Structure formats: structure tokens, C-alpha cells
Amino acid sequence: MNPTLIKKLQDFFQKNPITIGEPSTADELLLVEQTMQLKLDETHRYLLLHYGGVVIGDIRIYGLKNTELIGDETFVELTNDFREQMSIEAQQYVISVDDMGNPILVDTATREVILYNHDIGAYEKLFNSLEELILSKLNK
């Protein structure tokens, strides 16, 4: 992972400890990958292993053990819930939800962060990667 991003995350979370959840173990993440039948995004994996579910700027990035600012619902539960409601590709999973209730997903094949807009029934690319999304929030 990008060393600049790692440093920025360390600085951000040192100044904003309330935005940190509880880190997951590598074994927990391996079990999730086996259950979901996909490989987690590298940046999301890093966040989960070091910080858990977090809030960075105005975005909630769900984990298995979230900051209390997010609540208890995991990214696995979100993904399963949205899979019941709409068509999510096998290589995609939900990492967040916007203020309108639209899921924000990572596509593990392309690394892109995409939003599914319920109102128009279409996907919209938000960022080329989760890393790019996080940097955009940290640089504000």
C-alpha cells in the first residue's frame, strides 16, 4: 500500500481516535473471503487489519468491528442485504452507504469504487480505487 496514505491515515486517526473501530484479525478476514468467495480490496484489508470500520471525513467505511459512529452492521451484512435487493456482481461488495441509502461498492476486479443509484437503477464510478477515495477525504 502507498506509504504516503499509510502516514496520512496514522496522522488522521491519531487526531481523531473516535473514528476508529476495532481491528480485525487476518484469520477473520480470511474466513470472510472464503464465505463471500472473493478477495478483499487491498486498501480495505489494510483498514480492517489496523483500524476496523472507520469514518474518514464524511464517509463511513464499514468493517467487521466498527467505530460506534457507524453502528454494528458489518460490510458483510450490508453486502448480503443489498444482494437480496439488487444485482451485485460476484466480485463486488459493499463498503459504505451514502446519505440517500445507495450502496457504495468496491469492484475487486477493477479496484474501482462505484455507487449504485437506486433512483435511476444504474451504477456510477466514483473513484478509480478505495485508496483514491480515502486520499480525497484526507486532503480536504
Positions of PLM-derived features:
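A surface-exposed partner-binding patch
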Residues: 1-104, 138-140
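Short, compact, well-ordered microdomains
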Residues: 113-115
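Short, solvent-exposed aromatic-acidic interface loops
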Residues: 118-121
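Compact, glycine/acidic-enriched structural inserts
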Residues: 123, 127-139
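Short acidic-glycine loop/turn motifs at beta-strand connectors
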Residues: 107-110
